[in-house]
């Protein structure tokens, strides 16, 4: 119930942040700049999804070289939670997704996150079901230890997938005893 309350509370904020991009009309390819390409991709993923996705958080790992042992001994590194999204593959074979997820953070408190993800996708084998991806996610999160104030995030993404299942991950950079966290989840496409 608490998770549902957090998601409901912050869904409106995330939706309001994404709304201007979703309302932007498409422009010709010759007129596009980097930001217009980004907003067009977000809007197309919102309007024309090919798949609906289930996100299942798998692991958080605090880089041991960047933390005192006393802290890592107390931190939660099993971020159970769930998320949902919608995604599509573009004509170049790259992945685009919109998602919302809630999981238990390092302090075992609920952390919602939502945003847009993009990955350049490679299929190095004859079997096109196998793929590797590198890209980014841009979104908004909120944490208990920051009083659930919405915080924008721009993070790297990497993945390895086969068929409808993808192991996707990011790294949250930081300073000593802060950040420097590897976070990964499974994404299942339907």
From Swiss-Prot:
Homodimer. Its EC number is 2.3.1.251. It is found in: Cell outer membrane. Gene3D superfamilies: 2.40.160.20. Keywords: Acyltransferase, Cell outer membrane, Membrane, Signal, Transferase. This is Lipid A acyltransferase PagP. Transfers a fatty acid residue from the sn-1 position of a phospholipid to the N-linked hydroxyfatty acid chain on the proximal unit of lipid A or its precursors. Required for resistance to cationic antimicrobial peptides (CAMPs). Modifications of lipid A with an acyl chain allow to evade host immune defenses by resisting antimicrobial peptides and attenuating the inflammatory response to infection triggered by lipopolysaccharide through the Toll-like receptor 4 (TLR4) signal transduction pathway. The lineage of its organism: Bacteria, Pseudomonadati, Pseudomonadota, Gammaproteobacteria, Enterobacterales. Residues 1-29 form the signal peptide. The keyword Acyltransferase applies. Belongs to the lipid A palmitoyltransferase family.
